[in-house]
């Protein structure tokens, strides 16, 4: 397996959109919809590949904090992960961990002090285990919801 930062081109864009459609069809994240060109283009793209097959991807971008929060001071540059996805048949193989670690080392070498992300998974126990226990992230906040009325079909 190879982990690397990729340049976006039309072929890669199509592959990433197709992978995001698979993610959407899994129905594992609240409100997730497949990506469009506009969702992907402003981001740096990192891939995990086995031969010619993309096994997983991570994309995100660098920003500066607009205001001081309990975690980060105003003006501090950070890398925000927009998406991290691994194909279902390749989960629990360490691909997500390797993608995250690769990006962590890359942005750290560029002088960034933080990686930040939000997640919208239906399995919060697994995602907290991955990000907090395995990747060493601190838990900053949570946004919970309770649906009061079921959608009518």
Enumerate the language-model features and the residues they cover.
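Conserved acetyl-CoA-binding loop-helix of GNAT-fold acetyltransferases
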Residues: 86, 92-105
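A conserved beta-strand-loop-helix scaffold within acyl/acetyltransferase catalytic domains
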Residues: 58-74
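Short amphipathic alpha-helix that is part of the acyltransferase structural core
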Residues: 1-32
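Conserved beta-strand-loop-alpha-helix junction that forms the acyl-donor binding cleft
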Residues: 116-127, 145-149
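Conserved acetyl-CoA binding element of GNAT-fold acetyltransferases
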Residues: 72-88, 142
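Active-site rim helix/loop that mediates acceptor-substrate recognition in acyltransferases
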Residues: 24-50
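Conserved beta-strand in the GNAT
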Residues: 47, 53-62, 80, 85
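Conserved acetyl-CoA-binding loop of GNAT-fold acetyltransferases
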Residues: 131-142
